[in-house]
Amino acid sequence: MDLKELENGVNPDVHWYYQSKKLPLLRAAQRALAGGKPLTIVDIGSGSGFFALELEKRFGAQIAKIYLVDTGYSEGEMTATRGAKIEKVHAIPARIENGLVVLMDVLEHLGNDLQMLQSVKAACVGDNNSFFITVPAFQSLWSGHDVFLGHYRRYQIPMLRDVLRQAGFRCISNYYLYGGLFPLVWSVRRFRNYFKREPSSNMRPLNGLVNKMLLALNALEMKVSSANTFFGVTCVGEGKI
């Protein structure tokens, strides 16, 4: 999760984008819990911890431990949570068992995305670890938003699947989110790219009614999103490590 997206006063607890984006993650966690064992959540690039905390709200007692992994945490923040159920750390835990590894919009920030995935793979023990990854989709949507957030690239399914396979990830399922918004986002960004503007985030707080409408529409789409392998604003990868 990129904290820069929150600088314009966006509240992920109500904003349609975050509230809809968490839905496929919750489904992935439900599948990971099907074995009946308490789950360890490793949220890499967690920022505010929004997505991991949503998992804790939903599944609570079924989660044994949550690691919020982010190099932006201060020593004070890490010390305050050391040994707690929800712990802030700088590095990926050395040993992950029965885990769900979450990377929400992280890989696009890395010059070497494969190296990160290989580090995750090396930390996972056994064959009962799962992953859920989101990245921005389609290079044709590249804009000042990507520049502002420090992205290296946007992905399509073959590109994401290839790097996941290279890292040794298994049972990979890929699909797109926000397919319904793709034509509008594509048109707006192509138009804006004709003009020289200071790079900035597209994320803004919205009128309450508009926010509710967008949430309702996108929450509906999320019910069938796993069938969308054609186009969207976000690309998803999930499966086993």
How should each PLM-predicted stretch be described?
Residues 114-130:
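A short glycine-rich, Lys/Arg-flanked "PGG" loop and its adjoining helix->strand segment in the class I
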Residues 182-215:
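C-terminal helical/coil "lid" or tail adjacent to the Rossmann-like core of SAM-dependent
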Residues 1-100, 104, 114-117, 203-208, ...:
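Conserved N-terminal segment of class I S-adenosyl-L-methionine
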Residues 105, 109:
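A short His-aromatic
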Residues 6-10, 131-153, 157-162:
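Short, glycine-/aromatic-enriched active-site segment of Class I SAM-dependent methyltransferases
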Residues 75, 139-141, 180:
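Feature marks short, surface-exposed loop/turn motifs that line or immediately flank catalytic pockets
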Residues 169-179:
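Conserved S-adenosyl-L-methionine
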